[in-house]
């Protein structure tokens, strides 16, 4: 009996353009599939077309936009964990986590969230 390998976790990163490239590189090198968004419209489109294992909102996103993005994710994907880099928006209900903005902090936080969901792992594990 052969086991079929599960695909690596699918992540959505929301950030301003310069921050986006760096985080994309970190996560792809760690073996994750990653989709990016730079605006609320792009977040809406992404969340309507795919189910993400984790949504990351970078610290480069202004606080009012973080709130709107968080509410959009909750509307389309109520169970998706949201990992906020930098300061957390306390008004985002549900699975919301916070991490620093270092490469190690982001990768460790994503892995910890996914380990709570046994069926999902990055490709490198």
Whereabouts are the PLM-identified features?
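Non-catalytic signal-transmission and effector/linker regions of two-component phosphorelay proteins
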Residues: 1-19, 67, 89-91, 102-125
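Structural motif
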Residues: 13-17, 38, 57-61, 85-87, ...
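Two-component/phosphorelay signaling modules centered on CheY-like receiver
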Residues: 17-35
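Acidic, metal-coordinating helix/loop segments flanking the phosphotransfer/catalytic sites
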Residues: 38-54
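Short acidic active-site motifs
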Residues: 39-43, 65, 102
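Conserved phosphotransfer microenvironments
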Residues: 55-77, 93
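A short, hydrophobic beta-strand element within the central beta-sheet of small alpha/beta folds
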Residues: 70-73, 79-91, 98
């Amino acid at each position: 009996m052969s086991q079929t390998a599960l695909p690596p976790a699918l992540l959505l990163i929301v950030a301003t353009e310069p921050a986006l490239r760096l985080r994309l590189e970190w996560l792809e090198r760690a073996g994750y599939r990653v989709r990016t968004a730079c605006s609320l419209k792009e977040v809406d489109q992404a969340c309507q077309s795919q189910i993400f294992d984790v949504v990351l909102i970078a610290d480069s996103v202004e606080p009012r936009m973080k709130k709107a993005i968080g509410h959009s994710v909750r509307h389309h994907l109520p169970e998706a964990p949201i990992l906020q880099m930098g300061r957390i928006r306390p008004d985002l209900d549900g699975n919301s986590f916070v991490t620093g903005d270092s490469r190690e902090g982001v990768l460790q936080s994503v892995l910890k969230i996914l380990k709570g969901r046994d069926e999902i792992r990055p490709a490198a594990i």
